[in-house]
């Protein structure tokens, strides 16, 4: 499942290519992609009609596009979901009409998928997606939003599209009402506004968020009997960390995943949070971690942090720090890779 660096790479691509555009048409090829939408497909299409995309915002792994009516288009990527930007040539809306200027788009309509259109898998392609022909559809396309052009485009006459591609159908889109943040700070990365979608209100701030309360996170971890890795991956405690970056942060901080939170000393606890944040910063610089074509950014480009992983997926290999053989253990139904010499279970009290 994409974690913070991978979702942030997607957010940055959406911010570059989509902010300021207006929805001119909606194609729903798989209604299950909207299963979380109140009112179903019709409500989704009606709610997006003529709406401007105001920003691209992320908190942890949660991503949303605020709209000009005060709501947001929320995206849950699940295990295999992708948001891909596409566009070419003089764009037309779903009704075959030429799009008007930004802010004066025709209403969005549903479009029935054309079975005669070739289904070509472009998910692994690294070429800039905005030059792709919109008539080419990726294999697992579920929803497509047709969008107007904007003045900053290299080819202003060209429209664009946002595709939800999802092989396993565990992700989806929905329109959400916005609510105020509990602390009055920004909802997330990408917007200064103190609002976030209602369905993300329970999601904690992530370790790269300037407004995160590190002392508060550490205090809650140190009061818990649960294992440290489970705490790092609790999205209501601190968001954005999944299996990959939990293993990497624990290795960097020399902490064993099964050590209870209450065994963390203040110094080690701070070291763990700082190490996990630093690993994610490094991953973000190279686009995150991609193990296959399912993990790409909004332009279809893969990340390269897999080359720098120190723990995750390295069971049986030498620890690059001490030379011991890395081991794999299942903790709480999740695989954990660690160094038995560097990460001793109870060595966290300092």
List each language-model region with its residue ranges.
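Structured catalytic/nucleic-acid-binding cores of DNA maintenance enzymes
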Residues: 1-350
